[in-house]
Amino acid sequence: MKSKIHEHQKNTKFYVSKKTLFTLLFIGFNLVGFSQDTSNYDEALAKKLGGDERGMKTYVFCILKTGTNTTATAEEKKVLFEGHMTNIKKLADENKLVVAGPFMKNDKNYRGIFIFNCTTIEEAEKLVNSDPAVQAKIFEADLTVWYGSAALGTTKEIHDKISKPKK
């Protein structure tokens, strides 16, 4: 199919159709866009958070499951959960725990997660065993070494800024 060339275009040395021009511009803008360095890499921050060249580090991931203690009274559970929450705060304040939170009701008996700021199961066992609810077998812990973003180390700092203080 021949494209229509207008009379005034015949006398020019170079003619480019709109389709060709659009294609060339599209390719050109993409080459420029993809060649831009958009990295916000902050080596000092990566080092401070313990991150490697990918911004990642080793943690220990913990799933808390329903434990074997089925005889604790409501009052005992209340005291154990108060101790559980106090221990979470203590470990977070010491930067030994970077993420903690409960699971919603599920059929796997998963109750919550911890992500410990340590690199070995042995270190994490000591930390999780400092929890009164784990000691009383309300929870049991399943631990595994995990590789994740070093940015998790900033979770507490940010959480403190977005959670309202208790009255």
Predicted regions and their residues:
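Conserved, structured core segments of small domains
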Residues: 36-167
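Bacterial Sec-dependent N-terminal signal peptides
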Residues: 1-38
